[in-house]
Swiss-Prot record:
Subunit and partners: Homotetramer; dimer of dimers.
UniProtKB keywords: ATP-binding, Cytoplasm, Magnesium, Metal-binding, Nucleotide-binding, One-carbon metabolism, Potassium, Transferase
Cofactor: Mg(2+); K(+)
Reaction(s) catalysed by this chain's protein: L-methionine + ATP + H2O = S-adenosyl-L-methionine + phosphate + diphosphate
Similarity comment: family membership: Belongs to the AdoMet synthase family.
Metabolic or biological pathway, per its Swiss-Prot or TrEMBL entry: Amino-acid biosynthesis; S-adenosyl-L-methionine biosynthesis; S-adenosyl-L-methionine from L-methionine: step 1/1
UniProt protein name: S-adenosylmethionine synthase
Subcellular location per the Swiss-Prot or TrEMBL entry: Cytoplasm
Positions that bind L-methionine: E65, Q109, D252, K283
Any GO MF annotation of the entry: methionine adenosyltransferase activity
Amino acid sequence: MMRASYLFTSESVSEGHPDKVCDRISDEIVDLFYREGPKAGIDPWQIRAACETLATTNKVVIAGETRGPASVTNEHIEHVVREAIKDIGYEQAGFHWKTCDIEILLHPQSADIAQGVDALQPGEVKEEGAGDQGIMFGYACNETPDLMPAPIFYAHKILRLIAEARHSGVEKVLGPDSKSQVTVRYENGKPVGVREIVVSHQHLVEDMTSAQVRERVEPYVREALPKDWITKDTIWHINPTGKFFIGGPDGDTGLTGRKIIVDTYGGAAPHGGGAFSGKDPTKVDRSAAYAARYLAKNIVAAGLADRCTLQLAYAIGVARPLSIYIDTHGTGKVSEDKLEKAAAEVMNLTPRGIRSHLDLNRPIYARTAAYGHFGRTPDNEGGFSWEKTDLAEAFKRAV
């Protein structure tokens, strides 16, 4: 039975956090292959990319496996990497987009992996297997308009608003690196207020105090949160260490795939363990997690549950999901087994079916690298297609 009154906390990190710098670089490379492939006459279905990035003081290392056009050279990749770092905003002595050393260690995808992903299976036509085994979770709830848990939704929103002000030139003394954390108070199972707010934000003027940083960030925090959620009892922690001048990869080494809870539901739902960034959609760590969110969101959007957790499982080289599991946490209007059957009916959950339904063979991934992969708005270029609620009516009919 779900608790009625409790506190729940989630964190977010900005695009300038060292791990997020790496996620952005890895996803820029995936996008590069999808942009350049069609120009070289390569079918987007044949593109493969698995890119891992490490970033530290004045150094970026990229390693992984790819399959795509020969036109994507190391020089091309280096240019994309520098432009990404520039866009994030790093022009400091210890990490500058112009001068950091970039080492590229990409090589062709393993033939052993390729044969499992590309090969036809007996009795199936043009069906590709999953790129790896694993379990993936999707989640949705009716706590926010985007059907996301309130703590992670507002933690992202705080940093996104500050980042917009920084990029526009309004907040010139704030650096790219920042973190937020929001402790939400629930009553009768509904979010009603914030008890604790944490914002740690890099500043570009070395002697800025925590109080001065608070003067800068507090208006964005108040703008992000519902008006009556902040009270006299709300506790603020703004740059609680007192100083945050050295930021980004110069202050803390970053790696791709180390913010998987920030990327998803802020701890409000299970996680299968697989990261998203740097992976093309044959990797079900990414594409099946997107599909799981899509299905869970449409179940809630259809009014069939107030909360929904959905699990998918795959085996490498096998097209069909091994299992589909749904839990509506006591909020379902129909049984979970009916929803599980409906999920298999309304969407082809093979890797190829997911890529086709969500139109994932395109350069849409760099935009996902910060502020969450879920709870975002579908865009005209095909980004965040998994956030659509166009299956809601199909679910209603199927149950």
